[in-house]
A protein has these predicted regions:
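Anion-binding alpha/beta catalytic cores of soluble intermediary-metabolism enzymes, centered on
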Residues: 26-263, 267-340
């Protein structure tokens, strides 16, 4: 159908006025800013004597060198001297500022480094080019290093959407921790939080739900751990649990569920029920929230830096800063405990 004709178009005398749109709120979520703040916090401390165990590759030596340049550690290289110097030549690194303690192999390097820690010659152990299990075998055998509490592993995560770094523990060492082990794991993480300047950290004890039920033993453990904190068996923090991760992570999620909690949405420490849950949580935050991770083994007389992350130098420097902050925190606490 074809239509012929004319149409009259009129233009309004005055254009309609629209209300002014509110300004856009822009939040800049800089990746790594929490790590930078922790490194800055450690800058005013004296570098700590650190045994780099079996640093026979360029990656280990470069990581140690960068941490030394940042005035976080004073490296002592422990391992076969010939292989260490060959790796340094390949990486074009000058080893003249550092002491080298020559050993026959990685086994001897681990034994020597632990002996140095027992003799108070080093404050920290850092893994080089050897398996972590090989190093920890000697740490575990040395009663003077283990101390009264169990050793535990803690991840410190830089999650861009969060206003602070968060700790996840234990996602590496204790596969299915007992109640007593969980107590030590949490207390170790609390001590590290204090060293980072968090006076009263909030601990979320994670499980699959908030209701305590024997069907899920981790919920019962969480409730008991909270009672232990009330009785002074865990000190220096505010605990709540069991909490599902969404409740611990988001205050609005807790409100939607009707969960009243002083920890929800404000957790500094996420205590996971087992290694699998912790590992999954950390990897999810890495993949879905662009989190960066660094870690430390704590609870003993000297902290252990498990991985030299030359591929992510900021995370590696942060692990050295964590060790420095923990060591100096303990030194300050010891001074305060000695009567004047």
């Amino acid at each position: 159908l074809a239509v012929n004709g004319a149409a009259a178009v009129s233009w309004p005398a005055e254009l309609p006025r629209r209300g002014r749109s509110p300004p856009l709120e822009v939040k800049v979520m800089e990746k790594g800013r929490h790590y930078q703040q922790l490194i800055l916090l450690a800058k005013d401390r004296n570098p700590i004597r650190t045994a780099i165990v079996h640093p026979v590759d360029a990656s280990s030596l470069r990581a140690a060198s960068e941490a030394a340049k940042a005035h976080l550690i004073s490296p002592i290289l422990v391992g076969p001297e010939g292989r260490i110097r060959a790796a340094a030549e390949q990486a074009r690194l000058d080893l003249s500022p550092y002491d080298i303690i020559s050993t026959e192999d990685s086994h001897a390097a681990a034994a020597q480094a632990v002996a140095m820690a027992l003799d108070h010659k080093v404050d920290v152990l850092m893994r080089g080019a050897l398996a972590l299990d090989e190093l920890m075998e000697f740490v575990d055998m040395a009663q003077g290093i283990r101390g009264t509490q169990r050793l535990s592993h803690v991840f410190v995560l830089d999650v861009p959407v969060l206003p602070r770094p968060v700790l996840v523990t234990d996602a590496m060492m204790h596969n299915a921790p007992s109640l007593a082990e969980k107590r030590d794991i949490i207390q170790n993480a609390i001590e590290l939080s204090h060293a980072l300047g968090i006076a009263a950290p909030r601990v979320a004890i994670l499980s699959s739900q908030e209701t305590v039920t024997p069907k899920f033993p981790s919920t019962v453990d969480a409730a008991v751990l909270c009672k232990m904190a009330e009785r002074g068996q865990i000190t220096g923090a505010l605990l709540d649990g069991p909490l599902a991760f969404d409740t611990a992570f988001s205050e609005s999620a807790a409100m939607a569920k009707g969960v009243v909690s002083l920890v929800a949405g404000q957790a500094d420490i996420f205590a996971v029920p087992n290694v699998e849950a912790g590992s999954i949580l950390v990897k999810e935050l890495e993949c879905l929230a662009s989190a960066q991770t660094t870690d430390l083994i704590i609870g003993g007389r000297v902290p252990v830096i498990p991985v030299t992350r030359a591929g992510n130098m900021l995370a590696h420097l942060c692990s050295c800063a964590l060790a420095l902050l923990l060591v100096t925190h303990r030194q300050q606490a010891l001074k305060k405990s000695i009567p004047a």
